[in-house]
Amino acid sequence: KATLGASEVGLSGSGHIGEKATFLFSARQSYLQMLFKLLGLPFLPNYIDAQAKVRIRFSQRDELTVLALAGIDNMRLNTDEKGEETEYLLSYLPRLRQETFTVGASYRHYAGRHAQTVTLSHSYLNNRNTKYLGNDESSEDNLTLRLRAVEQKTSLRAENRSHLGRWTLREGVELSYSHYTNRTFRRFFAEQAGTLNYRTRLGLTGW
């Protein structure tokens, strides 16, 4: 099914894959950049996102679900616009770009009043900010900000759920690993000009 809205166009669908599997998906693409440009705004946002789900029923007791989500945000500057207020905003607003996705799989087994689930997932976020003095990208000497930050997390979880009359008992274990990196270059102008240039790398394990 295709949809057309005031700020986006979308596509979605669902159905069967053979006798044991079903699928569901949707995707959206905005055209906000065109609308914001017509309105004379100094920033032009745009996004694309999509999601998909597949469920496979191996038997009455066993099933597998796979889920994926993804998105891209991209905001660029409308340097064609003039005016004191617009030029002030353009002087400090950076260009932003962000990509993110999450993918996971969950296997579930039903055993009477009990159900066991094992889930594996991974998420990713990439954030980038860039700014040039006077929005002039013709020379790296004009670069005042370049930020690159990436966050990732991988998780493995096992769980048992038991229905005991009026009570539900749930127990489980989880292991996760998170990884973060940041590379930042910043040139600033105050009483004395200077630069800030650093890298960060961090890994965390949790359970």
Task: Enumerate the language-model features and the residues they cover.
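A subset of solvent-exposed loop/turn segments in beta-rich extracellular surface proteins, enriched
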Residues: 21-27, 43-44, 63, 71-87, ...
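Face-selective signature of the C-terminal outer-membrane beta-barrel domain
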Residues: 55-73, 94-207
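Histidine-acidic residue clusters that define the catalytic metal-binding segment
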Residues: 90-92
